[in-house]
Swiss-Prot record:
Lectin and alpha-amylase inhibitor. Acts as a defensive protein against insects. Glycans are attached at residues 33, 84, 88. InterPro entries: ConA-like_dom_sf (IPR013320), L-lectin (IPR016363), Lectin_LegA_CS (IPR000985), Lectin_legB_Mn/Ca_BS (IPR019825), Legume_lectin_dom (IPR001220), Leguminous_Lectin (IPR050258). Keywords: Alpha-amylase inhibitor, Glycoprotein, Lectin, Signal. It comes from the Eukaryota. PANTHER family: CONCANAVALIN A-LIKE LECTIN FAMILY PROTEIN, LECTIN. Heterodimer of chain 1 and chain 2. Residues 1-21 form the signal peptide. Belongs to the leguminous lectin family. Pfam families: Lectin_legB. This is Alpha-amylase inhibitor 2.
Length: 240
């Protein structure tokens, strides 16, 4: 009996230590270089330090190099996150064959069963949408001409307590703004670890071209802090 109690205590202490190890993340790109980025397709960093996702008849993406923890599998705790970026989309076209810019949370492993969650700034269908695996969960119309060639501010937040993903877009030069939000349990959609970043795709048309620049980007994620008593109860329930 004594040895069993000691084993339980040892396991409890190991799990309690692990419970404190959920990974909060914070980074800030005031300007970009290729360090700490995974660039795919035509994605590049300009001489001005802008992240450029210009593409014709193809797809490109740029993700932060380190995976981001969304859920702690030991405690079931889910992270809240807050990301801000400045983007500039300039469209020159005679046909609707370009579709703007996406902010995306994607699986780390390509063959994962986890879904992809994206916020689309869609210049083809003139809408801002929250999508899961390209299925529209919630969308609002926007007039992309209000932002064309302008430095627009974007903020995307997820509150793990209220389960709300919220998006706001604003143009400081004109005062125009758009907002959309949706209730979502990201832990049911995403893997415990994801990559975060941007993607863009374009159709082909001789006279269609869209420049998409991200001028700056910050991201932070944080797990709610259980008290020692709450962590103890969670872990004891796991091992008893």
């Amino acid at each position: 009996m004594a040895s069993s109690n000691l084993l339980t205590l040892a396991l409890f202490l190991v799990l309690l230590t692990h419970a404190n190890s959920a990974s909060d993340t914070s980074f800030n790109f005031y300007s970009f270089n290729e360090t700490n980025l995974i660039l795919q397709g035509d994605a590049t960093v300009s001489s001005k330090g802008y992240l450029q996702l210009h593409t014709v008849d193809s797809m490109c993406s740029a993700f932060y190099s380190a995976p981001i923890q969304i859920r702690d599998s030991t405690t079931g705790n889910v992270a809240s996150f807050d990301t801000n970026f400045t983007m500039n989309i300039t469209t020159q076209r005679e046909a609707n064959s370009v579709i703007g810019l996406d902010f995306a949370l994607v699986p780390v492993q390509p063959k994962s069963k986890g879904h992809t969650v994206t916020v689309q700034f869609d210049t083809f269908r003139s809408r801002i949408s929250i999508d899961v695996n390209n299925n529209d969960i919630k969308s609002v119309p926007w007039d992309e001409q209000d932002y064309d060639g302008q430095n627009a501010k974007v903020r995307i937040t997820y509150n793990s307590s209220t389960k709300v993903l919220a998006v706001s877009l604003s143009n400081p030069s004109t005062g125009k703004s758009n907002e959309v939000s949706a209730r979502m349990e990201v832990e049911k959609e995403l893997d415990d670890w994801v990559r975060v970043g941007f993607s863009a795709i374009s159709g082909v048309h001789e006279y269609s071209f869209e420049t998409r620049d991200v001028l700056s980007w910050s991201f932070s994620s944080k797990f709610s802090q259980h008290t020692t008593s709450e962590r103890s109860n969670i872990l004891l329930n796991n091992i008893l």
